[in-house]
Amino acid sequence: MELKTCCIILPLLCTLTSYAEALDHAAILKSPNELQLECSKYLPSIDVSQNVDCYDRCIGLVGRFWNDSIGRPAQTIARYYQPDTGSQDHITRTDQCLCEKVLTVPRNAYCQRASSGLQCYLDNYGQLLTGTPQFVPVTEIRAAQIFWDCAQMLQISRDRLTQIFKDGYNKTSEGRCLIRCFLVRAGLYSDRQGPNIGRFAVQCEGYTAEYEQAVVSCYDRLKKESLDSCSLATRTMDECIQGNQFSSSDIDGLEKLEVQ
């Protein structure tokens, strides 16, 4: 199987700005109720001019499980549901519904496709966990903020930060510690427990049992090498996450740094 490209987005340094985060790191967790409340503040329930309800599309965008270019809910939407215990065909039923009620809708009818997609999950996948916060994937903008935040904490100048990414972040101890800081601050990794597989699965859309086992086996192998904390974190990202052949990610891959 072809190796998937990296799902952690490294920022364009020319767009980095300083950013103040809460003390509990920068991970964002939101429940369906919170997604709905947030969208209710952004837009009315009905676009009067076009008579189209874009509320569900907004929920998908804020929860990072909807992308107009794909036109159907990402696999990550499943984290908001408890599958039906009495049936094992909830995935099949949901996929069938998506084929019949989403893929038949014109590609540019984004709001209609989003609403139909969410309805398929509500009707077929299981119980919506309305009050349970779930991890929201890191976007490119947030990644840039977190990296610059880490650079400030590690006393890495902007010029040096640019050089680290230009030369390769895994080439120096500074670069490796920068990656460790990013992973910890993004809520994807800890020195005590290693990679948070559930959150990485959301970030990289790797949901199979093979994906999880590959991460566990890879991390266990690296721990036996008695690496320092920064090297362990960086190699975990490089070898266990971004080199994971079982990731089904349709998220933008790791982007090579372009310094202007």
UniProtKB/Swiss-Prot annotation:
Signal peptide annotation = 1-22
Q: Could you state one GO cellular component term attached to this entry? A: extracellular space
* Subcellular location per the Swiss-Prot or TrEMBL entry: Secreted
Q: In which tissues or organs does this protein occur?
A: Expressed in the ovary at 48 and 72 hours post blood meal (PBM) but not at 12 hours PBM (at protein level). Expressed only in females with high levels in ovaries and lower levels in the fat body. Not detected in the midgut. Not detected in the head at 48 hours PBM.
Enumerate the SUPFAM superfamilies for this protein: Insect pheromone/odorant-binding proteins
**Which GO biological process entries does UniProt record here?**
sensory perception of smell
Q: List the disulfide bonds.
A: C177-C230
- Which UniProt keywords are present, listed alphabetically? Disulfide bond, Olfaction, Secreted, Sensory transduction, Signal, Transport
Q: Name one GO molecular function term.
A: odorant binding
What Gene3D superfamilies does UniProt report for this protein, alphabetically? Pheromone/general odorant binding protein domain
Q: One Pfam family from the UniProt entry?
A: PBP_GOBP
The UniProt entry, under InterPro entries, shows: PBP/GOBP, PBP_GOBP_sf
Q: What induces it?
A: By blood feed. Accumulates highly at 48 hours post blood meal.
Keyword Cell inner membrane assigned = no
This protein's record includes keyword Disulfide bond: yes
PANTHER family linked to this entry: GENERAL ODORANT-BINDING PROTEIN 99A-RELATED, ODORANT BINDING PROTEIN-RELATED
Family per record: Belongs to the PBP/GOBP family.
Q: What does this protein do?
A: Present in the aqueous fluid surrounding olfactory sensory dendrites and thought to aid in the capture and transport of hydrophobic odorants into and through this fluid.
Protein name per Swiss-Prot or TrEMBL: General odorant-binding protein 45
Q: Give the organism, scientific name.
A: Aedes aegypti (Yellowfever mosquito)
Primary gene name = Obp45
